[in-house]
Amino acid sequence: MRVLLGTLWLTLACSSVHATLSKSDAKKAASKTLQEKTQVSGKPAQERGLVVTDLRAEDVVLEHRSYCSAKAHRKHFAGDVLGYITPWNRHGYDVAKIFGGKFTHVAPVWLQLRRHGREMFEVTGLDDVDQGWLRAVRKQAKGLRIVPRLRFEDWTYEDFDSVLDNEDEIEELSRTVVQVAKSQHFDGLVVEVWNQLLVQKHAGLIHLLTHMAEALHQARLLVFLVIPPAVAPGTNKLGMFTNTEFEQLAPVLDGFSLMTYDYSTAQPAGPNAPLPWVRACVQVLDPKSKWRSKILLGLNFYGMDYSASKDAREPIIGARYIQTLKDHRPQVVWDSQAAEHFFEYKKSRGGRHVVFYPTLKSLQERLELAQELGVGLSIWELGQGLDYFYDLL
């Protein structure tokens, strides 16, 4: 494992943006408004010659809405595919209906688990639950499982300390969660809690999750766990969730949503999920390939816009990405080491920016890696991507 991490560090040490575009490229403005197709296509993107490294901004703008309607419900990827949906990017709800057959699980980001005192738990966020949408999605895609994300919200260290060592607390917590999932007609839950606790409490958290899983399984419900990357971004060190924890929970849980994105920090600008790092995260987590089918490799359908003048970054999603391509018509560059595209542009007052955003080619590379490693996919999130991305799934 040390050899693997050391090799990864050497590979990625120089993976921040080192390619520089010429001033003429950076200043190039669109001579005319870039066109967008509004009709769907009879062929998927991969049959239209769009999965390429030599990408042009005008081609992305032209084709991004044009997905293959004939194969919109046909799944190509062999493993499980979980897609997150957030209420603040409502296009994700439409994506789940249009492309529902391409997913095995959909996880709306709806629910929070709160503790109000001894053996007093409440699941909030139920106002966001749309039963009409649930029925519509299930009608469109038979067999699709709805597993909303449940995040432990506003828990103090004292809350965790009280619950993790108390069987009555754990039993009441589990009962509350199961009751809500059953009453709302969910198929299970995606639990997000691991990042909130220090390493010293991980044994207690494993005990809690094991008990929760038993209760959910008794009610014929699924349970997934959101986990951080097994290799800390930008380092050759192990992350907060390693093979040790994975081996204890893999027999108990139905799957793990692995957060293999957000690799680069504010400066220097760099890739969202360099391919060698993504590979290492899976191999370190499960080196013997014993439970690979339960790992859902994280795919970001958002990008990052890095500002050199502000020494900062901010997320960029599909609509703004397309508008940036229209406004600046940049030269798009392929980073072969990270297997990601990026481009530079300059604001009149905001200085130089660098944008990394997923493309058909970068996604195809990760789908092929997932197939090779024998893992599934978890997409954050469906409302942030471009419609023709789903041709690949």
From Swiss-Prot:
GO BP terms in the entry:
carbohydrate metabolic process; innate immune response
The residues the entry assigns to the signal sequence are 1-19
Record GO terms (molecular function): chitin binding; oligosaccharide binding
List, for all copies, the residue spans of the domain called GH18. Answer: 79-393
Q: Which family does it belong to?
A: Belongs to the glycosyl hydrolase 18 family.
The record's listing under Pfam families reads: Glyco_hydro_18
Q: Which CDD domains match?
A: GH18_SI-CLP
Q: How does it assemble?
A: Interacts with STAB1.
Q: Which GO terms describe its cellular component?
A: endomembrane system; extracellular region; lysosome
State the superkingdom: Eukaryota
Gene source species = Bos taurus (Bovine)
UniProt subcellular location: Secreted; Lysosome
Annotated gene: CHID1
Q: According to its UniProt entry, what is the function of this protein?
A: Saccharide- and LPS-binding protein with possible roles in pathogen sensing and endotoxin neutralization. Ligand-binding specificity relates to the length of the oligosaccharides, with preference for chitotetraose (in vitro).
**Name of the protein described by the UniProt record:** Chitinase domain-containing protein 1
Sorted UniProt keywords = Immunity, Innate immunity, Lysosome, Secreted, Signal
